[in-house]
Design a protein with these regions (language model features):
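Compositionally biased, low-complexity flexible segments
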Residues: 1-11
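Extended glycan-interaction surfaces of carbohydrate-active proteins
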Residues: 16-66, 90-130, 181-239, 272-363, ...
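Alpha-helical scaffold segments in carbohydrate-active enzymes
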Residues: 36-37, 92-99, 146, 164-178, ...
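Aromatic- and histidine-enriched alpha-helix N-cap/loop-to-helix transition segments
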Residues: 65-73, 81, 131-139, 160, ...
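Alpha-helical support elements that line or immediately flank enzyme active sites
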Residues: 70-101, 304-315, 368-381, 388-391
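Short glycine/serine- and small hydrophobic-enriched flexible loop segments
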Residues: 76-79, 141-150, 250-260, 310-313, ...
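Internal, well-ordered domain-core segments that constitute the primary functional module
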Residues: 136-191
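Long, repeat-rich segments with strong aromatic
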Residues: 237-259, 264-267, 271-274, 313, ...
Length: 451
């Protein structure tokens, strides 16, 4: 049964305060638990050809492979405990890439996909693939810069892979931005990492995640050899995704600093400008994804629409509107526990667990990791600390779960989930004002003008 939108309530700018009597978690305990989890989930070895690997499984046995953005998040936390492992995590991801700069969504290093699941992975053939043929939200250069800052014992790490990183982001521009507007496209819903988000329902229709047609979506890509430009030019099932492009812009800025090459700063400027000019809806006070060849706005309110808060160049008036009208509004994203993945006003909102509905309401830690520092930068210190406290309470109650119910705080889905340890990064580095390094610096970028 579809959940009706909640009745209108008076708008509030207050985030619910966790009860003083509830459990709390101290930073030393949080650190110990996080490090134990990451070490528990670590896998290392060599392929038959001698290629070494070392990475953190998100949550074995279900999530036992290497996923692109999971590994980036894991490395960001590893740097606080074991910078050498953080470096190896990212080097392993880079080793899975092709010579042309493509880096896959999922890599099956030590344990290939089972026969039931294999046909649904976006691979070149149904079986016997080392990796998928699709991308994921491209934050590798951002993670690389953060790990490099925590690697005084190996200063050369910052520049050792600059050429490979440049190839990666050049491939994304060439293959996923055929119209040259600065916004890259995804061609499958799981490429953003938000697999079953309701914002994809209309775009992918019967081919969306976990429906029978999803197999055809994968098979269609196989038949076209995963030629991104051909798929984008021929079909309408592709999206210029706001969240993907926010991380793309942040990573381009990191790459500009790592490489010293101005063209990546200029590309970041263009992407951020495009997000404001093409995706910002002044009336709704939200950023919308753009779907298909005609770039139709997807007017579904998810946390992706809040993600541009993380851009240091975002016009302050837009940032404050997002915080005050969305994040701190109890009708929308202000819930007792964290920031939900979908606005409470959306008919598709589901707070609890469902096998195929993980991005349709529950709270995820990476959301807070991206948005809380942005709120600090805008001066919402008290509000951001209260949201952080609610995330800490979730972990104190239920441990590092895959996601949580934003209304009652119940821990849901996978246990010992790797990227939920991102809370450590927020707690250990409260001075961090953004995801672009300790000070939130955006390099030499110009502030994007509101359109």
């Amino acid at each position: 049964m579809r959940r009706a939108a909640p009745p209108a309530r008076a708008r509030s700018s207050a985030v619910p305060q966790p009860d003083a009597g509830r459990a709390s978690i101290e930073a030393p305990d949080l650190n110990e638990q996080a490090e134990w989890l990451l070490r528990r989930n670590w896998r290392a070895g060599r392929l038959a050809d001698g290629t070494p690997y070392g990475f953190t499984c998100p949550s074995p046995p279900r999530y036992r492979h290497q996923w692109y953005w999971d590994s980036c998040f894991h490395a960001i936390v590893w740097r606080h405990f074991d910078p050498a492992r953080a470096r190896e995590e990212l080097r392993t991801l880079l080793r899975a890439g092709r010579l042309d700069g493509f880096i896959p969504h999922t890599v099956f290093w030590h344990d290939r996909a089972g026969w039931r699941r294999a046909p649904f992975y976006a691979t070149q053939s149904v079986r016997h693939n080392l990796a998928t043929a699709h991308i994921q939200t491209p934050l590798l250069a951002l993670a690389w810069e953060l790990v490099a800052e925590s690697s005084p014992d190996e200063p050369s790490f910052a520049t050792e892979a600059v050429d490979q990183l440049c190839l990666h982001y050049d491939w994304l521009e060439s293959e996923r931005d055929p119209d040259g507007d600065g916004l890259i496209s995804i061609i499958h819903p799981d490429e953003s990492g938000l697999d079953d988000s309701p914002k994809y329902d209309e775009v992918f229709g019967w081919m969306r995640h976990y429906l029978p047609g999803y197999f055809w979506l994968v098979e269609r890509s196989r038949r076209l050899g995963y030629d991104s430009r051909a798929i984008i030019g021929r079909y309408d099932e592709h999206v210029e995704d706001v969240l993907v492009n926010v991380f793309y812009a942040l990573a381009l800025r990191s790459l500009a600093r790592l490489s010293g090459r101005d063209r990546y700063r200029e590309r970041a400027d263009r992407t951020e400008q495009a997000l404001v000019e093409r995706c910002w809806d002044e009336r709704a006070g939200m950023f919308w994804d753009l779907a298909g060849r005609y770039e139709r706005p997807i007017s579904v309110s998810t946390w992706s629409s809040l993600a541009p808060l993380a851009l240091p160049s975002l016009p302050e008036e837009i940032g404050r509107r997002i915080v005050e009208e969305q994040v701190l509004d109890s009708r929308r994203f202000a819930t007792p526990f964290g920031i939900p993945s979908v606005s409470l006003e959306e008919p598709s909102f589901r707070a609890g667990w469902h096998l195929f509905r993980c991005w349709r309401g529950p709270t995820w830690v990476n959301t807070g990791w991206l948005l809380i520092p942005a709120m600090r930068r805008l001066g919402y210190t008290h509000e951001s600390e209260r949201i952080l406290a609610s995330y800490l309470e979730l972990v104190a109650r239920h441990g590092f779960r895959e996601y949580y119910n934003p209304l009652n705080g119940e821990g849901l889905a996978a246990r010992h989930f790797g990227w939920s340890t991102l809370l450590v990064d927020l707690v250990l580095d409260r001075s961090r004002l953004g995801p672009c390094g300790p000070s939130g610096s955006s390099g030499t970028s110009n502030r994007v003008a509101a359109s």
